[in-house]
């Protein structure tokens, strides 16, 4: 039965006392280390089931970690609810904002909201924090992941030099740009020196980004930021996130990805500053909402399973989506191409899952082309078809092996079908399964349409009326055959005697006159007949029946 939340929270202090009595001396030492709420929260959320411990011991350990985090003996019910609401609010934030807000250690949901809203007015703080993460990720991450969040702790202030990130400066416009010189405080000089001593790998990857031709968008001073209108601020915000994506990929934080040869050139003007960017990575787009969200873990802190990019459009997981934060502050998400819109040619390729190989639009197979390779569905000879279309690999240029696609096949008789629904319906003929049974004569039918037609024989309903004579019919097929009498239409013409027929069945029977085909054979004497009615009459002679007495 459901338990009231207030009652459940009211039981926490008593359970905590019962568990405290079982704590050992080693648990007391552990409790001192878990004094930080953030550390206790991470231990609780990252706790995994231990097979060796068993379910009872695992539940006991999980309860202890929950008490360490929520502290029911100290916090009230309202405070515990506030902690849970704050955690959930931080979890649903976009990844870049989430990491920054967590580092500020907000004490309530209102404080977290204030921090998020402050980023819209001054994104420079988030930009500088991102720069610190990229430049000193190996060294500074240890300090940023310290178990306790002290009130007086201030992160070092860094301004990023574009040359050090392997990105070229853009030409400055009317609004003079701030020079991005790395200003280090005394307590971070040694740390960044150590980070630079690893170099080669980091610096080599950063210099390689010079091919992108991207320039770091500078952090505008407050007076310059206030002069921008809403559109320019949104452009500034998007370009900042785009540059952040290049920094992250250049610093080796994002997961590896196959090389893309397509290049998109675009220029944007912001506050008199012209930025010309050459990208080797396509800008985030989505095609008809069919492209699923790509998830990327930047590993900037040890939070488990952080989904950093919640935007609906991603470009193969390399660059964080420009709309990941823009969509958070605004209602629309630009960059999505709907139906009927022209997509850039660089984004027309279909990428195979897990291989990074691409297919050109010409290699997509339409249903019509696919049907030309399908075997006869009722031949029973073939259940696997091979498509002869070969797709070439983007890197090696070697043709792939032909792609096999299995068709639904009946295990009883071996018939092959195009769709699973056809196979399921066919299997009823073997099992004798019937879905629709007449309540009057108890006759059963497989199809609902046949069942409806049969019911009309009992009710006398004839909903299909002839427009010429007003005669009624129970179904449309009978009406169509009748209308051909009025129109004189005889679509089935014998190629031998040129006699025409209204119905196909009559045409087929007539053809047996010319071909001499006799498909109906008597099981007693072996005599064959062209029509089933002739066979019925003949069989009565063997049985000695006289139908007319």
Curated annotation (Swiss-Prot):
Q: Name one GO cellular component term.
A: nucleus
What cystine linkages occur within this chain? Answer: none
Q: Where is the SCAN box domain?
A: 41-123
Gene Ontology biological-process entries: regulation of transcription by RNA polymerase II
What UniProt keywords are attached to this protein's entry? DNA-binding, Metal-binding, Nucleus, Repeat, Transcription, Transcription regulation, Zinc, Zinc-finger
Alphabetized InterPro entries for the sequence = KRAB, KRAB_dom_sf, SCAN_dom, SCAN_sf, Znf_C2H2_sf, Znf_C2H2_type
Zinc finger (C2H2-type) stretch: 408-430, 436-458, 464-486, 492-514, 520-542
Using the UniProt record, give the first listed, main subcellular location.
Answer: nucleus
Pfam families, from UniProt? KRAB (PF01352), SCAN (PF02023), zf-C2H2 (PF00096)
Q: Ranges for the KRAB domain?
A: 211-283
Q: What does this protein do?
A: May be involved in transcriptional regulation.
Instruction: Tell me the protein family, please.
Output: Belongs to the krueppel C2H2-type zinc-finger protein family.
Name of the protein? Zinc finger protein 18
Q: Which organism is it from?
A: Homo sapiens
Instruction: Give the encoding gene's name.
Output: ZNF18
């Amino acid at each position: 039965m459901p338990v009231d939340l207030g009652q459940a929270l009211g039981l926490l202090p008593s359970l905590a006392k019962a568990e405290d009595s079982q704590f050992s001396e080693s648990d007391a030492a552990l409790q001192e280390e878990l004094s930080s709420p953030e550390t206790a929260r991470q231990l609780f959320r990252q706790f995994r089931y231990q097979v060796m411990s068993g379910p009872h011991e695992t539940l006991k350990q999980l309860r202890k970690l929950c008490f360490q985090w929520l502290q029911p003996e100290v916090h009230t019910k309202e405070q515990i609810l506030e902690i849970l609401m704050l955690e959930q609010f931080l979890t649903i934030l976009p990844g870049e904002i989430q990491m920054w807000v967590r580092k500020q250690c907000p004490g309530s949901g209102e404080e977290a909201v204030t921090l998020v809203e402050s980023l819209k007015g001054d994104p420079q703080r988030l930009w500088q924090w991102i720069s610190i993460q990229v430049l000193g990720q190996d060294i500074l991450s240890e300090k940023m992941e310290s178990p306790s969040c002290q009130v007086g702790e201030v992160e070092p202030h860094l301004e990023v030099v574009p040359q050090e990130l392997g990105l070229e400066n853009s030409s400055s416009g009317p609004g003079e740009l701030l020079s991005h010189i790395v200003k280090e405080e005394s307590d971070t000089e040694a740390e960044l020196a150590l980070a630079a001593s690893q170099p080669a790998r980091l610096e080599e990857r950063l210099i390689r980004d010079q091919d992108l031709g991207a320039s770091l968008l500078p952090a505008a001073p407050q007076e310059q930021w206030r002069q921008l209108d809403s559109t320019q601020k949104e452009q500034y915000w998007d370009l900042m996130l785009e540059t952040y994506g290049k920094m992250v990929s250049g610093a080796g934080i994002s997961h590896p990805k196959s090389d893309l040869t397509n290049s998109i050139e675009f220029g944007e003007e912001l506050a008199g500053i012209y930025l010309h960017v050459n990208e080797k990575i396509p800008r985030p787009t989505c095609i008809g909402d069919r492209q699923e969200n790509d998830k990327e873990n930047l590993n900037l802190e040890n939070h488990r399973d952080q989904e950093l990019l919640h935007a609906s459009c991603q470009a193969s997981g390399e660059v964080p989506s420009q709309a990941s934060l823009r969509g958070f502050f605004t209602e629309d998400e630009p960059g999505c191409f709907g139906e009927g819109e022209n997509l850039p040619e660089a984004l027309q390729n279909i990428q195979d899952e897990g291989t990074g190989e691409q297919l050109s639009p010409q290699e997509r197979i339409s249903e019509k082309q696919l049907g030309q390779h399908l075997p006869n569905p009722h031949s029973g000879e073939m259940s696997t078809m091979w498509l002869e279309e070969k797709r070439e690999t983007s890197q090696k240029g070697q043709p792939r092996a032909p792609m096999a696609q299995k068709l639904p096949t009946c295990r009883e008789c071996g018939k092959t079908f195009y769709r699973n629904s056809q196979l399921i319906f066919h299997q009823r003929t073997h099992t004798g399964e019937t879905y629709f049974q007449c309540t009057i004569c108890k006759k059963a039918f497989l199809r609902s349409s046949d069942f409806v037609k049969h019911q009309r024989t009992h009710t006398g309903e004839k909903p299909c009326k002839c427009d010429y004579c007003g005669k009624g019919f129970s179904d449309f097929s009978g009406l169509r055959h009748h209308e051909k009498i009025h129109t004189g239409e005889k679509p089935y013409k014998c190629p031998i005697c040129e006699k025409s027929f209204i119905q196909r069945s009559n045409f087929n029977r007539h053809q047996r006159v010319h071909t001499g085909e006799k498909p109906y054979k008597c099981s007693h004497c072996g005599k064959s007949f062209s029509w089933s009615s002739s066979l019925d009459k003949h069989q009565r002679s063997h049985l000695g029946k006289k139908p007319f007495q």
